[in-house]
Amino acid sequence: MSVQVKLTKNSFRLEKQKLARLQTYLPTLKLKKALLQAEVQNAVKDAAECDKDYVQAYERIYAFAELFSIPLCTDCVEKSFEIQSIDNDFENIAGVEVPIVREVTLFPASYSLLGTPIWLDTMLSASKELVVKKVMAEVSKERLKILEEELRAVSIRVNLFEKKLIPETTKILKKIAVFLSDRSITDVGQVKMAKKKIELRKARGDECV
């Protein structure tokens, strides 16, 4: 339902102020949209790279799959997949807070160097790398999701400003301006007619004297 606009000088002033605010804020929104588009592209590349690293780490650990069941290795192998802590933080990108991983700490695996196979170190290193790469891949996807959502929201606002708010406000201003102009012309005409009537009355009065 359309909002009823008062065709007054005060309404004209308010709508003019509104249009000025919209036109001032639109370039800022457009700049943010451009920055977000660039950051989304970077985030897409980063997510793809992290996912690739995770797949490669998975393939490396898969090569040891048959060795996981060896009794001497079971406990330390299981430990190598356990996360002790994740140092998360946030950074501001184009006005948006996105997560970032500073460090992933896993529980240390204790085992006897003499009582375990020589390849165990390599396998444990590969398993830890898999866990870290998985965390990094998940966070990179979350970063991408947040940036894409913000870009969508900003794009909607830019479109709203350009296609609706600014054109509608401009249209309202023109409508009020035309009305006020017509009324001004009418008022001037009425004043002139009133003056003529007064002059005619005076002229008739002079004739009667």
Curated annotation (Swiss-Prot):
Entry's Gene Ontology BP terms: proton motive force-driven plasma membrane ATP synthesis
Keywords: ATP synthesis, Hydrogen ion transport, Ion transport, Transport
One of the Pfam families matching this protein, by short name: ATP-synt_D
Any one GO molecular-function label of the UniProt entry: proton-transporting ATPase activity, rotational mechanism
Superkingdom assignment: Bacteria
Keyword Transmembrane helix in record: no
Similarity annotation: Belongs to the V-ATPase D subunit family.
HAMAP family: ATP_synth_D_arch
Cited function: Produces ATP from ADP in the presence of a proton gradient across the membrane.
Xref: PANTHER family: V-TYPE ATP SYNTHASE SUBUNIT D
Name of the protein in question: V-type ATP synthase subunit D
Organism: Chlamydia pneumoniae (Chlamydophila pneumoniae)
Gene: atpD
